[in-house]
């Protein structure tokens, strides 16, 4: 499972790299709404990040319910046990992003978009907390970190275009890069301990 988590986090880093590479080369196109384009990155990366978090929490707990017949926890064993829960989290994440994008594009009032997006954000994180973060006390600090960082995207959504994008860039560094490094560190530490 650790290798699967690292591979998935590498995909997140690669997609983020491509987005920022595109951003640097298209910075001259000041007419482009960078924020709305950013959502395409998020539609791919955020479900992956949520799934890697769930996998890490399952692994960290060493809970028997996630183990396969060989007594291993892996992507397949977690999905077999909890695919309905994971699909629900991914769907809630999709709606969170969809309402944000609709607000960004002006198809929905920004305040309504924020409210609806926040509802789906809270629903997805409530499920993660209930079914995965709660499995082990060591999971909770990471859960709270992710919850706080992701909540700040909602705050940044309220800023004007310039400050919103600067905030999103900073938040992406913490939610993707530092998070990926943290997961890598925790996995390395676990491997050394076992």
Predicted regions located by residue number:
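Polytopic alpha-helical membrane-helix bundles and their juxtamembrane interface segments
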Residues: 1-40, 45-194
């Amino acid at each position: 499972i650790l290798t699967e988590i690292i591979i998935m986090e590498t995909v997140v880093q690669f997609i983020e790299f491509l987005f920022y590479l595109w951003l640097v080369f298209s910075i001259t196109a000041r007419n482009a709404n960078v924020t709305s384009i950013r959502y395409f990155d998020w539609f791919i990366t955020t479900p992956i990040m949520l799934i890697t978090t769930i996998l890490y929490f399952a692994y960290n707990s060493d809970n028997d319910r996630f183990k396969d017949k060989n007594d291993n926890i892996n992507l397949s064993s977690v999905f077999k046990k909890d695919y309905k829960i994971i699909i629900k989290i991914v769907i809630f994440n999709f709606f969170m992003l969809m309402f944000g994008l609709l607000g960004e594009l002006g198809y929905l009032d920004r305040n309504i978009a924020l409210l609806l997006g926040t509802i789906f954000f809270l629903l997805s994180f409530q499920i993660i907390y209930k079914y995965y973060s709660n499995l082990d006390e060591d999971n909770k600090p990471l859960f709270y970190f992710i919850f706080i960082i992701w909540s700040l995207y909602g705050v940044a959504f309220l800023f004007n275009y310039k400050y919103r994008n600067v905030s999103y860039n900073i938040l992406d560094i913490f939610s993707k890069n530092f998070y990926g490094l943290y997961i890598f560190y925790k996995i390395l530490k676990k491997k050394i301990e076992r």
